[in-house]
Amino acid sequence: MGLGIDPSVAITALIVVILVVPMDCQRPQLVNIGAVFAFDSVIGRAAKVALEAAVSDVNNDKSFLKETELRLLMEDSACNVFRGSFGAFELLEKEVVAMIGPISSSVAHTISDIAKGLHFPLVSFAATDPTLSALQFPFFLRTTPNDAHQMSALVDLINFYGWKEVISVYSDDELGRNGVSALDDELYKKRSRISYKVPLSVHSDEKFLTNALNKSKSIGPRVYILHFGPDPLLRIFDIAQKLQMMTHEYVWLATDWLSVTLDSLSDKGTLKRLEGVVGLRQHIPESVKMEHFTHKLQSNRSMNAYALHAYDTVWMIAHGIEELLNEGINITFSYSEKLLHARGTKLHLEKIKFFNSGELLLEKLLKVNFTGIAGQVQFGSGRNVIGCDYEIINVNKTDVHTVGFWSKNGGFSVVAPKTRHSQKKTSFVSDEKLGDITWPGGGREKPRGWVIADSADPLKIVVPRRVSFVEFVTEEKNSSHRIQGFCIDVFIEALKFVPYSVPYIFEPFGNGHSSPNYNHLIQMVTDGVYDAAVGDIAIVPSRSKLVDFSQPYASTGLVVVIPANDDNATWIFLRPFTSRLWCVVLVSFLVIAVVIWILEHRINEDFRGPPRRQLSTMLLFSFSTLFKRNQEDTISNLARLVMIVWLFLLMVLTASYTANLTSILTVQQLPSAITGIDSLRASEVPIGYQAGTFTLEYLTYSLGMARSRLVPLDSTEEYEKALKLGPTNWGGVAAIVDELPYIELFLAERTGFKIVGEPFMHRGWGFAFKRDSPLAIDMSTAILKLSETRKLQEIRKKWLCKTNCAGKSNWNPEPNQLHLKSFKGLYLVCIAITVSAFLVFVLRMIRQFVRYRRMERTSSMPRASWSASPTLRLRELVFDFVEFVDEKEEAIKRMFRRSDDSNNNPSHVGEVQADTEVPRN
């Protein structure tokens, strides 16, 4: 009995079966993969063996590609771009699905472009150039870490030992240049840098290498980073030995090229030349696969990490091919339409085929994840293999031994990374350590890694050539041009505590007419023009970003200085006049007293009497003119004339004195409007600052003061002048803002000023060095040691306490005191009239005395005989004149009248003779 099936249903079922049930494609019997690399190279010789072994193992594993055989086709690039490119095209003609290699980074750049154009995967096991990026070369993969990863390990090693500056020696090709560029980037992250670069060509002769290394010796750092391709000759170390650069002062760090080279050497005697060199070696974890591979190739002792990566690369491509075949994708090839247009040329590019599923194979390779003999094979971002640890190797005279391990997340340790992970440690930064290292010269003590200076190349130190406050630092203005000052002495004394010799020279900076700008000083240290700067340099954040400062050797802070009011008002009544004017006024009273007494003595009874009475009358008369009308009246016209002028002068003096004293007392009672930086900031008065210092930057940017308010000043003389002029006069200021050491020196030399408010913006003075200079740390330690002695106080006393160290100012005469020159005109008039009156009086007395002497000669009255000696006669004459002047004017006139009457009436001759002798009162 047959089944009745509807034909339409049968057809539908057949279609569903065809669409749903997968059909296995015909697996190819043979799949070609290509390899382009330098056969006759340190890496190439080992890699060739590893590649052949890998293909053999893949084909022997029947559970893997099943009946498909993997065939390896190899072309020798000879580290040549042209030969490498030609070899790549040769392989493409033979229908390869993927290509392995090359070793050379320069060849890798070219073949990566070919892979990009023809869409086939290119997998390198040794091209470590970090610029071979997935963005630029999307079909390029590598199963070895790039140099950026290796440089990260090397920089951690540099940072582990505290070195900040290095010299890089590298091959002048893509590998060397781009590797050192990655090193520079990693060093920058650690605040370190490459001080000098030595590019070397593979064709450089011994003379060139010698000159290049010899030139680098003049640079301070002694840490050398070597980055080349493997060099079996190791010429660089022979030359370094000849130049005595393999001593205890030097550090030689090599990337993994050295370990690859050493693994290929059969003569261990070569190690003697490399004593103390430290390098990196890719860490290959122990595994069963590794043991099996090592046992299989035990006859080949030149095997290295890159050869192991080559072995894993073959397996990785095999995994990708297996994934493609399992998905039923056929291995097919096509001619490139672009290359078909080249038909007929001698290059025969039309024969080149490309794999149709190249992009799919690339996707499968990127998803590969298996454990190879070199470790885990898995790609991360940037299409670089994930994870790679390094061994830190050290060369002694007889062997190469491992002193530790490095991992990206774990840092350094003497325990292998696999062991640490098994102990479930997640952070090893605090436990970082390495084993004992033999350094160049055979020592175990870590080299300092740099030389500050030597006699041939001393430390160049720039110092400011100050023209004000020269006690701190300046250049002597004589033939010696010696640099001296407080800061210089501190530096020299601190340098004695540095545990090594530092030859140095001082070079002054500035035009000698004004103090230099200290920011320019710092910038020159940053730019490498000078190695350090010594002087009164304030440590401020903007400068600390450019240079490294030592420990402050002097504490500073900004302070506000204003004119001071004297708190002691005991002698305030003397301030309106200068001391010179007071002396002149006092002398004037005495002179007027004497002149009036002389003019009034003969005719005024009030000015006669005993000498004591006359002296008191004379002084009281003169000084009482200040306060009230005199009891004694002047009689003579000459005395009245003198008194008129004197009283006028006295009136002007009194009025001026009263006005000035009132002003002083008023100001004395008014409190200063400026009490500190806050009140100064709130006001609009002009402010002085020292030109060239950071004060201007702080006042404008930090406190927001208008630049128009700020007046640059450059010396203590300008400070004093500006403060005395005050804010109302052009060029004057209400206050000065400056650092405390300058102000202390200013107050020690200039009095009449004071500090108001508390110091602010507390900073210090330090010595500036180039960034990451080790001398900055050693000088800081030296300054701390110096401060524990009395030497720092002695230096301060020597330079800053020449006048006084009290820091408090004494009173200075008022700026608006009245001087003698203010009354010079009045005094000249008074002196002229007084002298004239006195001369008139004297002439009158002489005339009367002459007449009196004639009367004596014509009279018959006997008189004393004259002395024979002229001197005695002159003295007698003077005494007679004084006695004559002392007589009353009335008696003299009466005598003269009687003499005149006797001449007219002879009868009176006897009477006159009787009265010829002048009466004495």
Curated annotation (Swiss-Prot):
Tell me what this protein is called: Glutamate receptor 3.7
Residues on Cytoplasmic side: 602-608, 630-640, 844-921
What is known about its subunit structure?
A: May form heteromers.
- What is this protein's function per UniProt? Glutamate-gated receptor that probably acts as a non-selective cation channel. May be involved in light-signal transduction and calcium homeostasis via the regulation of calcium influx into cells.
Instruction: Give the signal peptide range.
Output: 1-25
S-S bridge residues: none
Q: Which organism is it from?
A: Arabidopsis thaliana (Mouse-ear cress)
- In which broad location class does this protein mainly occur, judging by the first location in its UniProt entry? membrane
What keywords does the record list, in alphabetical order?
A: Glycoprotein, Ion channel, Ion transport, Ligand-gated ion channel, Membrane, Receptor, Signal, Transmembrane, Transmembrane helix, Transport
**Listed SMART domains:** PBPe
- Where in the cell is the protein located? Membrane
Expression by tissue, per the entry, reads: Expressed predominantly in leaves and siliques. Also detected in roots.
Q: Where is this region: Disordered?
A: 896-921
